[in-house]
């Protein structure tokens, strides 16, 4: 137990230290903190000083100048005759940042987010080991290296709700896969309620988690599921009423100056869903905004999920469900994949599930293990490299990050497809890479995992757990995989 506590501490401080390396990096050449980030900080400042969401006085007094030297795009409109202005962003992140922003400004806010990212990494490691029975040593290495790589470390200090949402999601998974007690149900309600209040885009993954919880417990814990359903229903109604009352619409976008023709324009005026389907692979492979060029370890993402479904479907289905829902939102709902932000933003919320799946894969296959380690280390170096460039005014985190001089990124970008290019060469490159991933996936799921010769294996299965005992009288290897239903 003490050894595992040390591993948790190692992951915490590794995540925190790597995240802090970019704390002074510039988002753009005109601002340390830019785009949507100032909106969250101004709202946090208003909550700290005025105890309300109205940022009109903060905008008039240019309270953003310490972190945004240029004139700020206000993003909001007058909501009434008194000139009230409320940022078109959900309020839970500003509420979390209100205390650090009030006490220490933008720097304290970034530190608070970095600490929260470290906590998210710790919870992810705990879930991997305690809920999915991954080797503590391997899980520690995988979680540490991937939380220290983009995009996880990128959003550890950038002021967005992505990392708090990832914490809410992995906490929900920890609760759902454990015992269904009244305290656990209360905790799950809090975690799930937090997600939409961080951003309305997390409603689909919230619904997926809630439905899975009800499916898992409907027959065995009827009383708890009734209670859960009623409270979550009340929470949803309250969410809509409060948004209608404060923001003038069903979502925060009703107060935004970009959506004066309708709040649901946030997904696009005439979204071409067929064209957006290209993002299914683009989110992984795009030479600028994909996961793989920055952290090559994510080449293992699809093989990892395929392997977990094949080998441990019942246990890992929740991981895959969350990943599929989150990936679908990033593909078909998000306005764009190429935005004014660091790559992978829309995926951060579900990447803890991918990291756990990759840890399971690394435990079973040595080749994949070292690939994930080395690909993750490349991601760590990429971030440290760019953080130094962005801190010394040679590059920025959201304008020209793809012009970094980091050689491994540049080498991969040269051979990966550009999803802003609709020519045949980009399509061919996409097909080649997808074929490579498909081949790697097939080889992974068709290869039998090795069992040591000469050691008998006893396997005992019930509806809720699997117990494997393997070895001799002098040495036993016991593994227990549990899906609690009580």
Task: Give the residues covered by each predicted segment.
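Membrane-interface alpha helices of multi-pass inner-membrane proteins
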Residues: 44, 142-147, 175, 184-199, ...
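Interfacial juxtamembrane loops and adjacent helix segments
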Residues: 49-101, 256-274
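Transmembrane-helix motifs of polytopic, lipid-linked glycan transferases
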Residues: 108-133, 167, 171
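Hydrophobic, aromatic-rich transmembrane alpha-helices
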Residues: 121-122, 214-217, 291-317, 354-361, ...
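Transmembrane-helix signature of polytopic, membrane-embedded enzymes
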Residues: 124-150, 166-167, 181-187
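Short acidic/glycine- and proline-prone juxtamembrane loop motifs at membrane-interface regions
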Residues: 154-164, 290, 343
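Perimembrane helix-loop-helix junctions
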Residues: 177-178, 204-237, 241, 302-312, ...
